[in-house]
Amino acid sequence: MKVLAAMSGGVDSAVAAARTVEAGHEVVGVHLALSRMPGTLRTGSRGCCTIEDSTDAWKACEKLGIPYYVWDFSERFKEDVVDDFIAEYAAGRTPNPCMRCNERIKFAALLEKAIALGFDAVCTGHYARVAQDEDGNYELHRASDWAKDQSYVLGVLTHEQLKHSMFPLSDAQTKAEVRAEADRRGLSVAKKPDSHDICFISDGDTRGWLAEKIDMTPGEILDQSGAKVGTHEGANAFTVGQRRGLKLGTPAADGKPRFVLEIRPKENTVVVGPEQMLAMNEIRGIKISWAGEPIAEVGAGTEFDCMAQVRAHGDPVPARAFVTTDDDGAPLLVVNLIDPLRGVAPGQTVVLYQGTRVLGQATIDTARSLVSSSTKVD
């Protein structure tokens, strides 16, 4: 097979490419220039598209004896990922830019270009597994190392995208094993630290970064009764479940801390309350997609058992789900959680599993609490 290896400049993508070469495939490496402006390239940053990352990717390809290219996807990345991130926060929602990038860039723009150029597949350093059922349908599963598993952020992939995707690290037991393999192979990135921040916010200060992009207007912080308990410098920078950064002039009657329960961007207010009010037992999701072929119960519109996960490394909880339609006739995923989840925010993604298999995902529109009404952004 002719395989395009996406090279981030990190240890995972380097070892993934090495394993693909070792498997006998014809491999070409490509580094994606994503968040840079034309004519610039950042240095000394923890984000993506640094000179160091590009150099590390080139060194890995040179060591493996494969061609290396840099493709500039910065304009599409800005439009589909960065601008979307800003718009979602401006609307009071909490987006997942990594999932958006996988959906629009790595497994859309990159994969489309790869196939157009005659490649059979794209391989990445994601910790996940693609499998085929007895009928030849492609499925997405968790990786062997659940601590590093990234199937959550790949839950947006379609059957056709899975068909052309390779995840060579699917059977890696630990990250330490991957680093040791990189060291044995003489790859210079063996000890390179992992990246944990949003790649286009290099200093990790999401709130400060958003303040430069969104018109932040001071407003009121209210408790669940509607009484003013503090002020904020901009409602758009908060997310449901947040505690830090709240300026509360009036302490709670019980003396316990309060958390963000709701963001009302039209009113420029933030609603806070006790931690127990963050517990949600019903999620309603829009923009539904299925990883591979939908399960039979979905087509029948009946309720099915699953595990629901709302954060990349969050704990999945047992649930029952079904698909219905909203008032406008659009598909709506309803997930009833057996065990409540804390701080479920509109804009986040709920991913459904059965065993290790990813069933699909939806963007959270509303979440209903055990003790309150619903959290919704209009």
Curated annotation (Swiss-Prot):
Keywords: ATP-binding, Cytoplasm, Disulfide bond, Nucleotide-binding, RNA-binding, Transferase, tRNA processing, tRNA-binding
Disulfide pattern: 101-199
Subcellular location(s) of the protein: Cytoplasm
UniProt-listed InterPro entries: MnmA-like (IPR004506), MnmA-like_C (IPR046885), MnmA-like_central (IPR046884), MnmA-like_central_sf (IPR023382), Rossmann-like_a/b/a_fold (IPR014729)
Pfam families assigned to the protein according to its UniProt record, in alphabetical order: tRNA_Me_trans (PF03054), tRNA_Me_trans_C (PF20258), tRNA_Me_trans_M (PF20259)
EC number, UniProt record: 2.8.1.13
Keyword Amino-acid biosynthesis applies: no
Catalytic residues of the enzyme: 101 (nucleophile), 199 (cysteine persulfide intermediate)
Residues covered by region (Interaction with tRNA): 148-150
Recorded catalytic activity of this chain's protein: S-sulfanyl-L-cysteinyl-[protein] + uridine(34) in tRNA + AH2 + ATP = 2-thiouridine(34) in tRNA + L-cysteinyl-[protein] + A + AMP + diphosphate + H(+)
One Gene Ontology molecular-function label: ATP binding
Organism superkingdom: Bacteria
A GO cellular component annotation in the UniProt record: cytoplasm
Principal location class: cytoplasm
Residues flagged as site, Interaction with tRNA: 126, 348
Residue ranges of the TM segments: none
Residues reported to bind ATP: 6-13, 32, 125
Example GO BP: tRNA wobble position uridine thiolation
Function field: Catalyzes the 2-thiolation of uridine at the wobble position (U34) of tRNA, leading to the formation of s(2)U34.
Protein family per UniProt: Belongs to the MnmA/TRMU family.
Name of the protein described by the UniProt record: tRNA-specific 2-thiouridylase MnmA
Originating species: Renibacterium salmoninarum (strain ATCC 33209 / DSM 20767 / JCM 11484 / NBRC 15589 / NCIMB 2235)
Lineage: Bacteria, Bacillati, Actinomycetota, Actinomycetes, Micrococcales
Gene that encodes it: mnmA
